[in-house]
């Protein structure tokens, strides 16, 4: 069972209660704190589109604490981050692994942050296939295409050479917040809010 805190605010019309995530959304904060799947991607995408409609010139903050997940769901979030007019600032809290790290790097340049004790992990996409040999071959080729696309984008976002990204993502590659800054995944390790 998931518990979601309720925030009560006083207004000129009396009291108003919000779940904590709706209250944070009023301040243009989105929290991605779960596995990335179609459901979480739909929620994040909808919130970004809503915030763009509310004010297309004001930044959106995306807090990430995620073990990663589905590549296609992650690309839905990534593409929306690039599509919306407001800059999307990314902040790693806890862990940004796999697609979570990819989305962390996808934030607006100069606006990608990690808290000091957070961890970042990149690796190649995971997949599996069953069935006839021809179908398995088709799926394997598709995973290689996706791997190359992820590596190319990560190279562009970090400034690292494509070949280095290929080597580093061959296996799980863990980084501290400072190491992620040196790598180019984040721009700054932030100890206190500015």
UniProtKB/Swiss-Prot annotation:
A Pfam entry, by short name: CLP_protease
Entry keyword Hydrolase: yes
Record keywords: Cytoplasm, Hydrolase, Protease, Serine protease
GO cellular component: cytoplasm; endopeptidase Clp complex
Complex formation: Fourteen ClpP subunits assemble into 2 heptameric rings which stack back to back to give a disk-like structure with a central cavity, resembling the structure of eukaryotic proteasomes.
NCBIfam families: clpP, PRK00277.1, PRK12553.1
HAMAP family membership: ClpP
Protein name: ATP-dependent Clp protease proteolytic subunit
Lineage: Bacteria, Bacillati, Bacillota, Clostridia, Eubacteriales
Gene: clpP
């Amino acid at each position: 069972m998931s518990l979601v805190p309720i925030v009560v605010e006083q207004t000129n019309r009396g009291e108003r209660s919000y779940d904590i995530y709706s209250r944070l959304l009023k301040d243009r904060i989105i929290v991605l704190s779960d596995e990335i799947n179609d459901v979480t991607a739909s929620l994040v995408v909808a919130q970004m589109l809503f915030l763009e409609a509310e004010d297309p010139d004001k930044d959106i903050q995306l807090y990430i604490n995620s073990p990663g997940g589905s590549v296609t769901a992650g690309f839905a979030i990534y593409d929306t981050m690039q599509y919306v007019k407001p800059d999307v600032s990314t902040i790693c809290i806890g862990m940004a692994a796999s697609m979570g790290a990819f989305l962390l790097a996808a934030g607006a340049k100069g606006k990608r942050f990690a808290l000091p004790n957070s961890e970042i992990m990149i690796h190649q996409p995971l997949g599996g296939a069953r069935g006839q040999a021809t179908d398995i071959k088709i799926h394997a080729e598709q995973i290689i295409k996706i791997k190359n696309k992820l590596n190319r984008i990560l190279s562009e976002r970090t400034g690292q050479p494509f070949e280095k990204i290929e080597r580093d993502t061959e296996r799980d590659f863990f980084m501290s917040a400072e190491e992620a800054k040196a790598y180019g995944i984040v721009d700054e390790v932030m100890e206190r809010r500015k």
